Structure formats: C-alpha cells, structure tokens
C-alpha cells in the first residue's frame, strides 16, 4: 500500500503546482493544461479506489490510520477537481462574452436599396449591455452552484473523517473530555459551513439586485 500511497500523494502535489500554471496559460495552451490536469485527477481517483481496498486489509492496529490518510488524499483531490471546474466555467463564460462582443462590434445593418451600412446605435448598445448582465448573472449562479457542490463534498468527507477519529479515540482510550472537544469542534465547523453558504447566497442576491 505504501508505494501506491506515496505515488498518489506525489501526483496530488504535482496537480497543485499545475493549477498555478493553468492560471498563467495562454489561450493556445490552456486547453492542453486542463486536459492534463483532468487526466491526472481521474488517475488519482482510480488509485484511491485501490487504496481503499488495501487500507481495509491492513493490520488492525494500522487500519484506521491508513484509512485516514486515504480520506485526506480524497479530500485534497476533490478540492482540486472543484477548483478545476470553477476555472473552466469562468474561462468558458469569458470566451463566450468575448465572442459576443466581437460579433456585436462587427455587426452592421444594410438597407435593401444600397450597400449603405448603418453603424450600431444606442439601442443596440443598450441591448448588448443587458445581454452581458444576463450572462454575468448566469456566471454568478453557476459559480455559486459549484461552490455549494464543493462544500457538500467536503462536508461528507469531513463527516467520515470525524467518525474515524472518534473510533481511533475509543481505541486509544482517550478521555471523554477530549472526545467532547472533538465533537464540539465538528459542531462549530458545521455552523461555519452553513454560514459560508448563506453568505454566498446573500452576495449573489445583492449582486443580482444591483445588476437589475
């Protein structure tokens, strides 16, 4: 199990460095970097399935620790997957807006009688602004949805990790005071997560109200 764990952990660290390279990539290479990162993430998920099987076969005194290490890797790669999806969503919206802006700037109206062209007037510019506002709202909603999905995935992972920590605490014979502190911290983390979700929704609502 250990060689596969070390290999997978190294891949996670490499993806973290590639995410920084993704932010600096130009339009010609950004798709290649995205595909490279996605392929690595899929390979890591495959390794994690194998590691979960191997961790369940570890000796009893090492099994819980092995599962915790696998859960930490799973949490890290889920976070990276969410970050990649958010980046792709922002890039796609930005590229779509650029295409629409170029189309609007190059669009002219031609009369039936001659080749005379009529430049874009204020009404068309106003419609263009409304169109961009609608796409901006879609971008906010899509980004908020991605954030909420990421929080849900992290909550499930943390919930499983908390249960394993409590199991280890019982095995090691930790005091009830220590276990209560662990449960209190998990309870506080839950409210922090809910507060973050409510704050995100409030910001999205205020931005939509401002834009409309």
From Swiss-Prot:
Keywords: Acetylation, Coiled coil, Endoplasmic reticulum, Golgi apparatus, Membrane, Protein transport, Transmembrane, Transmembrane helix, Transport. A motif (IxM motif) lies at residues 118-120. GO terms for molecular function: SNAP receptor activity. The modification N-acetylmethionine is found at residue 1. GO terms for cellular component: cytosol; endoplasmic reticulum membrane; Golgi membrane; nucleoplasm; SNARE complex. It is a single-pass type IV membrane protein. Residues 212 are vesicular. Pfam families: V-SNARE_C. It comes from the Eukaryota. Part of a unique SNARE complex composed of the Golgi SNAREs GOSR1, STX5 and YKT6. Interacts with BET1. Belongs to the GOSR2 family. Involved in transport of proteins from the cis/medial-Golgi to the trans-Golgi network. PANTHER family: GOLGI SNAP RECEPTOR COMPLEX MEMBER 2, VESICLE TRANSPORT V-SNARE PROTEIN VTI1-RELATED. This is Golgi SNAP receptor complex member 2. It comes from Mus musculus (Mouse).
